Amino acid sequence: MSNTAVLNDLVALYDRPTEPMFRVKAKKSFKVPKEYVTDRFKNVAVEISNRFGEDDSETVTIDSVPLPDLADILTLGREENFSLFIPKHRNLSAKLINIFLQAENPKHLLSIACYAHDRVNPYLFIYALSVALIHRKDTKSLKIPNQIQTFPDKYFDSQVFSQGKEEMTVVPQGLRRPIEIPRDYTASDLEEEHRVAYWREDLGINLHHWHWHLVYPTDGGEIVTKKDRRGELFYYSHQQIVARYNFERFCNALKRVERLTDWQGPIKEAYFPKLDSLVAKRAYPARVQDMTMQDLDIPGQNIKVDVDDMIRWRDRIYRAIADGFITATNGSKMNLDDVTGIDILGNIMESSELSPNRQLYGNLHGFGHLMLSYIHDPRSHHLEPFGVIGDFTTAMRDPIFYRWHAFVDDVFQQFNGSLPRYTAEQLDYAGVQITDVNIKTPNAPDNEFRTFWQQSDVDMSRGVDFQDPGSVFVRFTHLNHEPFSYNITVNNTGNGVQEGTCRIFLAPATDERGNPWLFNNQRVMFVEMDRFKVTLRQGQNTITRNSTQSSVTIPFERTFRDLDTNRPAEGSEELDIFNFCGCGWPHHLLVPKGTPDGFKAQLFVMISNYADDKVEQDLSGSCNDAESYCGVRGGKYPDKRPMGYPFNRVARQGADTLQRFLTGNMIVQNCRIVHSDRTVRPRS
């Protein structure tokens, strides 16, 4: 069996994940050793395999190998929900990841995975296998299916599945119609927060959050957790999520999200997710209005944490920021300086295994998610599962996610506010002056973005178990924008060619009341649009950059990539890149929605000195086209500056507005975002 064939066989394990291995998967019929078959099916496996086998299926014979000890891992039942916020689940996933990482080669891994497949909780199995495949050198070129294909129940209303199963059972392949999801299916317009549900519940955003945490696990050993500036990237990627959400709120006449700081008062936001777990066979619980966070005691999950614990952890972190150092497990002091301090703080806040002292600083971010997710049954009296905020895959659907992360980001901003302010000389680039910038959108006035609604189809058949094979599509509506380009005029008065990093950000022009911004309020509202290297010859230079080249986003086709289509050649560099780059922000949400009369925004462009920005490394064959939020596979973050530069610190004395903050290598352009309430039908 060739290595390519084995890799394809590993991908087949994602097909219909709750079905046993002896059922045909992705047109492959797996013949597993008898000892691999669970007791439930030992007497019927061959008969069922023959009955449901497909005539054109390929037979894959699995070798018998020494079997791993799964005893601890099996303490999580097959029909339970799985959450990486639950420490017990994190530990179990780390154990399974290490079992998969220690396999001698892909063929050995396939055999172990086939054994684990029918025993381990499906959510846990797919997560651990995905992390292992991404981080093993001999499988990193494997194209991992996106989670919509594997577990569509985490993305679609439960009504979709009854319609889908009917379509798959009754209607022949080729005659099936897409099942359309209404844009407003979780609440009515009477609910104010529902104005931005199209953004929170967007499939691409939730896939991005899932994939980011797949690439940056909190546990599993250094091979999967120890990545360059991962704590800082946790801070920055989530800060940008909150900033983008606030931008979207402004476009819908909502004020900035309020930080969740009162942990003993009522929470006004309710949320009813309308999702059912097809693995746990239970609905995700709702949260009604005015519930309060309470001490958690969930014996079945070994969770016991009090609100007072959270307050102690918060206060210790604030004290560390004020003191300028944290205390490591061995009692030594680690300075929170202006280079590594934000990274250390990020590891503490996320509470990854890179945290210098989990015992002292706790798990503030993670247990915040858990307290909110069990708010309906904090002591497990009713044996209710956690809500959507307790799962990376579904958390961004819930309005409370953004209130919690507004608090988390405020902790980081407390630290950023303690750092030395950039001087004008530090920000400037001698000899480089930006004289003009404009945005070009086809058939639109200069400096105007245009957005609209787009309908797209995604195949969910691979995640619908125990049904006849064949595609069944779900049609959903999402925001999109017209392609555009930046045209930047730069004057280089230096003695020769200069190299720089062009940094492009966008922010609302005024606050929610229509008042001019103070710089230190506006700086956290800027969303990164692009970052790229430029070469400036002497004299005037014109830089043109297309929106599709953004360092923040990945294309629509990669966000919703299919197992079989758009696949690069086996063994090619493109295939390795294709897989890791599933992490980027969805391109269809690069531009905020805007308003019909044109939402006023400010485009900020800066060119910094590349000599101060560059990181020496070979990026050939690495994924770096969505580097801003996801970094570079197997390499260092490709910008030496702090993430979010130059908006990561409080402004210098006297620079109380954006205009006063500017130096010669910066420019601001007023622009508008015009939304057309039209819907474009699916792409062919």
From Swiss-Prot:
Keywords: Copper, Disulfide bond, Glycoprotein, Immunity, Innate immunity, Melanin biosynthesis, Metal-binding, Monooxygenase, Oxidoreductase, Secreted, Zymogen. One of its GO terms (cellular component) is extracellular region. Cu cation A binds at H209, H213, H238. Cu cation B binds at H365, H369, H405. Its EC number is 1.14.18.-. Its main location: secreted. It is found in: Secreted. Hemocytes. SUPFAM superfamilies: Di-copper centre-containing domain (SSF48056), E set domains (SSF81296), Hemocyanin, N-terminal domain (SSF48050). Optimum pH is 8.0. Residues 1-51 form a propeptide. Pfam families: Hemocyanin_C, Hemocyanin_M, Hemocyanin_N. InterPro entries: Di-copper_centre_dom_sf, Hemocyanin/hexamerin, Hemocyanin/hexamerin_mid_dom, Hemocyanin_C, Hemocyanin_C_sf, Hemocyanin_N, Hemocyanin_N_sf, Ig_E-set. Optimum temperature is 35 degrees Celsius. Glycans are attached at N81, N91, N330, N416, N487, N491, N546. Disulfide bonds join C581-C623, C583-C630. Binds 2 copper ions per subunit. Its cofactor is Cu(2+). PROSITE patterns: HEMOCYANIN_1, HEMOCYANIN_2, TYROSINASE_2. Dimer. Might form a homodimer or a heterodimer with PPO1. Might interact with PPAF2 (via CLIP domain); the interaction might be required for PPO2 activity. Belongs to the tyrosinase family. This is Phenoloxidase 2. It comes from Holotrichia diomphalia. The lineage of its organism: Eukaryota, Metazoa, Ecdysozoa, Arthropoda, Hexapoda. The gene is PPO2.
